[in-house]
Amino acid sequence: MTPPTRIPFPVVDEVSRHCLQEEEPETVHIEVHLPGRLDRSRLRKAFLEALHRHPRILMREAPGGRYRRRYEWELTTEPDVEVVSFPEPGRDALRDARTRALVEAPPLSLSPPIRLEVVEGAGPAEGSEATDLVGLHPLKGRGERRDQPPPGRSQNTTVLFLTINHTALDGPACLRILATAAEIYGGKDNSPTPAPTRPQEPPAPPENAPSNWSRPARVAQGTPENSPGNGLLVTELALPHRPKGSPYTVNDQLMVTTALTIAHWNKEHGQPPRPLRITMPVDDRPRDTTMPIGNGTRLVEVPFAPDELRHGPDDMPAFLRRTAQRTRALKSLTRPQLGHGAGLLTAPVTPVAWRAALTRGLRRAAAPWTSTTLLSNIGRIPYPLDFGEEAGRAHAVWFSAPARMPRGLTVTTASTAGRLHLALRWSRALLSHGDGAHLRDLFEHYLHTTEVAP
């Protein structure tokens, strides 16, 4: 019998594996809302076929001795477990599935390190802003929807919860798997839409951006909760208006919104002004069936000086242009996913257990220089996620990223059907659900302030 193929952990996977903590599992969650129902047997078959079409996802951590030099992925021909499950329907089914996505990471020892839960006819989720209003036209007046009870949800709706162990995979790769499953299930073309083309801009003049060597601001502590782990709040907003020909993108508007939201929050909580640094994942992979499956994003850090964050309405156009120049320059840089230092840390010259201890120690020592927060903007969902006539096409898609300390807060956005889907995820050691709701309100306010003429 041929032994399974083994692949050494890439740098991102190894660093993540070194720093795992039971209290705050490294999970990514994707939540897809469909207007209709799915046939259970057909969905299981379609998802299994999608896994086979992207065989790199069929992997588990290979066992190894104490003095091994590497962690390795072991590729399998079939899943070790049934990936698709159907929780008991009920009023709390949506809330419970979201909770499981935050507290139960799929094990690395079983192939594949993901799970798909299918919640049928779920009622409103308590403790979350993912109401049953997703995909409907907004009511008149900003913020009105939030304070009104959700209407009765059709018993035919379905929510797909894909939970991913982030040590092995990232959200965009697993969204590709879902798109393939949708195409197999529904027989509809789920090819990605072409990425928007941006006009080539002349190189921006050098600017006096804050140094990455200065300690950035931390998100001020709110009202921490006693239980460990992450909290999550999701909401649906209107996409910010951006005049045609603007020199900035929606991503730049979201970056400015995130910076202003945290600056406002910190000021409310008595923190002195400090530079902010916001980590931004950049993904250059193709979105078609050739997309490499794994952790494929590289991380860049967008700095903001305290003076930039004390702006008036007249300053917003210049602030957006400056942010656009900054993000464009950072995206154009060629660099390793986690920087050059991570490559040295993961060089297999010593036993992996020794490198793990060193990595954890360096992470603790570098905590004061860790970026303030992470903004992951998936952008417009590139696939229709159309499961056919009965189940229909996705009308809302949320992602959330891990929010371990010292950051303690991540912001994830995506757009579907002309709406912006925002997820705020936080460490319970830093914030409570009430704090998350206030940050959501601040985000909505500052997003509106970015709607200006160029």
PLM features per residue range, with description:
Residues Q200-Y248, A263, D284:
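Flexible, P/S/T/G-rich "lid" or insertion loops adjacent to the active sites of thioester-utilizing
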Residues L237-L309, T323:
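Long, internal scaffold/assembly segments composed of regular secondary structure
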Residues M1-P203, N251-P275, G388-P454:
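Non-catalytic N-terminal regions of enzymes
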Residues P286-R287, P382, L430-L431:
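Flexible loop/turn segments at secondary-structure boundaries
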Residues I164, A168, M280-D284, G379:
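Short, flexible loop/turn elements at secondary-structure junctions
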Residues V282, N377, L424-R428:
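Active-site proximal loops enriched in glycine and acidic residues that flank catalytic Cys/His/Asp
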Residues N295-I381:
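Helical lid/core segments from catalytic subdomains that handle acyl or acyl-like groups
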Residues K267-E268, T370, I381-G388:
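Acidic/His-leaning functional-site neighborhoods
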